[in-house]
Every structure is written in structure tokens, then in C-alpha cells.
Swiss-Prot record:
InterPro entries: FNIP (IPR008615), STK_FNIP-Repeat (IPR051251). FNIP repeats lie at residues 242-285, 286-331, 332-406, 453-496. Pfam families: FNIP. Residues 51-84 have a biased composition (Low complexity). Keywords: Repeat. The keyword Repeat applies. Residues 47-86, 100-121 are annotated as: Disordered. It comes from the Eukaryota. The keyword Repeat applies. It comes from Dictyostelium discoideum. This is FNIP repeat-containing protein DDB_G0274063/DDB_G0272642.
Amino acid sequence: MKFSRFKSRNTNYYTNTIITTETQLNNSNNNNFNNTTTINHFNKIHQQQSNNNNNNNNNNNNNNNNNNFINFSNHTNNINNNIDNRSDKKRKLNCMEKSNISSSSPYTLTSTPSSSSSSSSCESSLLNLNNEKLIEDKIISFSNENVGNIKIISMSDSKFTIYNSNNTDYKELLFWKVWRNFFLKNEILFHQRLYNLYSSFEFNDLKSLLNFQYREYLQHITFSFYFDEPLSLINFKNNNNYNNNNIFPNSVKKITFGYSFNQAINQNSFSPNSSSLTSLEFGESFNQDIQINSLPPSLTCLKFGKNFNCPLSLGVLPLSGNLKSISFGLSYNQPIQYIPNGVEKLKIGGNSVYNNKNNNVNNKNNNKINKYPNSIKIFKFDKYFNDEIMVGTIPNSVLKVKFGVQFNREISMEQIPCSVTEIDFGLKWNQPLNEFSLPKNGNLKSIIFSHFFNQQINANCLPDGLTHLKFGPLYSKEINLNHLPSSIEILMFHNSFQSLNLLKNYNNLNNKKIQIIYYN
């Protein structure tokens, strides 16, 4: 926190900066009263100030007894004290004895209780502080005295700022208090270096994880390609430092299994008390049943590999409401019926969608349909998906649809829910568009055509309400801007499109402003 000095225009000395803190104390009768503490910051005091202090201001003393807090400014042109020099010196000496602070300081601290306090207390107390560091120390010490607010007042412009123990300025003051301590700063930097080195680490086996010297710094654990051990400490029962529920440190937020991992997941696999694990990613080979209540309730992201195809019964996926993202791989063809409410992002493989056609006589699950919660907002298809999209495949709550790399099928407005606001077509998608391809309700705002798209954009094939339109690097068709919806605001093309000069009627848009962006 900085203590500013303000130069007065009419005098050759500096005006005051006042810092006031409001705190609640108990008097001898156990009644609450306000104690106001003011710090007056003097840089240079004019030689005549001591003479002016003896002039007038009797009325100010009477008003001060009725205020909950008093700001002492000592600005010599505006505020004069009517206190006898001898009594003033006596108060200073009494209070300096209490504070053990030298009287030679240019900084003063004055404390005045309200009129409800006991008569034995001083009307005012003056403490001298040696420098700005002592002022910071005093303000920090207020946190132990039930301080409510800290008020900084500039007498030059009558502006003031109020700080409290919860705001960023107060916390910044505490931060610098620690950071300026040489020992504490070195300790912080030392642990920061260890965190940077070991917060993310790869292990080949559980033994190396259990014996890892810097376990407490781990946040992301990755197991190597060949790792395939049961997640149990049975083989380490002679190790007294760990119990069966502490394979992973409580600091870990993400676990990524390698390609070969294919072990059962049970209630002993993860610590039931773990509240930090938020992301779990299985490898391509994983295809094991998961017991109910085995996955940590703190999970927010869950990703299965390409070969996973085990049914998920009710209770397998955490019902805590924290789970926000689930991703299934290519092989998954089980009915999706128990996705917890609260999941916002869902990625499914091609086989899961194919089973919903209900026309595969060899599929035992063809009489079951997927059930999605209304919380799903982002719907993604696996990169290998390239089947026809059946009506109802995409949930009606979805806002964004993203197709996979291989998808290259015609689409119709019946396949895309009216709730969708953004569509991202896959890398290979290159199908013609007509007036029945996309929803016309006006909710669709953004379309991204990817790498291979190169179809003519005709009139009325894009819906009204569309604002953002992006074309891939291979697009080389002429675009008549009059054929685009009047709502278009941003057009994005690859740099190669700019040299083709294929934008028509750009100057005949009737004062309509379209931002054209070229990217690399």
C-alpha cells in the first residue's frame, strides 16, 4: 500500500494524508463504542505551524465528543488546535510511553474513543511512527484488533478511500509484507521451483509413485505406455507409510493412464476422502467394469478410451453434480441411459449413435434408446463417426454441435435441434447446402466450415440470424455478399482466398458493415 504526499499550492509544506481505521471495543461497562485511529502523514511542516496551533477552535473540541470517529488532519491553513502546549506535550509523552516509539518521527497516530467510554481514558492519544514501514506494520496489526475499515483521506482534494480486511488492497499489503521478508521470499521461490518441476510427472509403476520424494507437489500424474498394475497397495502391505486408500496424494487433480492399462476399478482404487481429483482419463486398452461408487465424487471430467464398451449402471458415474464432461470412444455401443444431471459436455463414438437406429437385428440393445439430461450444452462426435444422423440423436438442450474428422454426410434441419447456436463441421465435411439443411428459427449464430469444404453458397441456404461465418483454407468459390443473411457481422477466410478476389457486391451492401478477417 502506498502513502502518497500531496503538495499544497498556497503553502511551502506538504498537506496531510489521513488513514482512519474503525474498530469495535468494549469499555469497562462491557458496552460497545467506536475507536477511531488516525494516522497523519507529515513530510515537511512549515516553521510557523506551532504558532498557529494556539489560536482558535474551541467549538471543535465540543463536537469531537459526539462523533463516533474523528479524523485529525493538522493541516495548518484549515484546522487549528486550541490545546495548551503543556497538556499536548503531556499527552504525547503518556502515549509514547505506552507505545515505546520515538518522538522524533514525522508520522503520528492518534486514537480517540467515543463519548461513551470511561472518563479515565485520554481524550486523545498521539503515537509517533518512525517511517512508512511502521505505518504498514501498524495497519497490519489492526487485523488482530477487530478492525472493520481502513480509511485513507487526502486533505488536498478531500478524497478518501476505504479498505477492509477482505478487499484486494488489504491482501496486497499483506503480500508485500511477506514478500519483503528475505527468508520467506526464498522459501516461496524454493517451493515454487519444486512445484514447477514435479507438479506433473510420469511414472512407470506404483512403487515409484509411492516412494516419490516430492509427492506433495504432484497435481497431474501420468502413467507410462506399458503401465498395467492393479490400483491396490496389497503388494505394499509392509509399507507403514501408506494405507490402502492413499495410493494417490490428496494434491492430485488429474490422472492419465497409459495405453496398456486395463485393470478393474473398485472402491479401493481411489481414496474416498479425495476431494481434489477432478480429471480422469483412461487409455485406449481399458475395457473393465467399474463398480458403483468407485469413482471420486469430485470428478468434473471423465474420458474413456477407444476400446471401452462396458455398460454403465446407475451409480457408476458420480451423482454429486460435479461431473461436467464425459467422453466415450469409438467402440462404445451400450445404451447411454444414466448420464448424471449437470453434465454439460458429451462426446460419443460412432457405434453409440448407430445403435439408436433400432435397425440392427444383431444388437441386443436395439430396443433401448439413449437418455440425455437437459443440462447438456455441447455435443461432440468421435473423430471416426461417419454415419447418418437420426432425428433425436442430438439432445434438444444442446447449444453447440461439433462433428468429427471423418464425418461427411448430408444434413437436414430435422437432425439439428432448434436450440443449437453454433455448428462446427468436421475436417472432411464437403456437402452442398440448401434452404432445408439448417434450422430457420434464428437461433443459429455461428457456422464453421472446415478444411475440405468447397461448396457454392446460394441465396437462402444460410438461416437469418447468422452472425459469424468461417470458411476453410481450400474454399475457392465465388461469394455474393447479397446472398448472405443480412445479420452477418463477421466473415473469416484463409489468406489464400484474399488473392482470388471472389467477394462480389462488397460495395453494394446499403451501408451494412461486415468485418472480413483473413487468417493463416
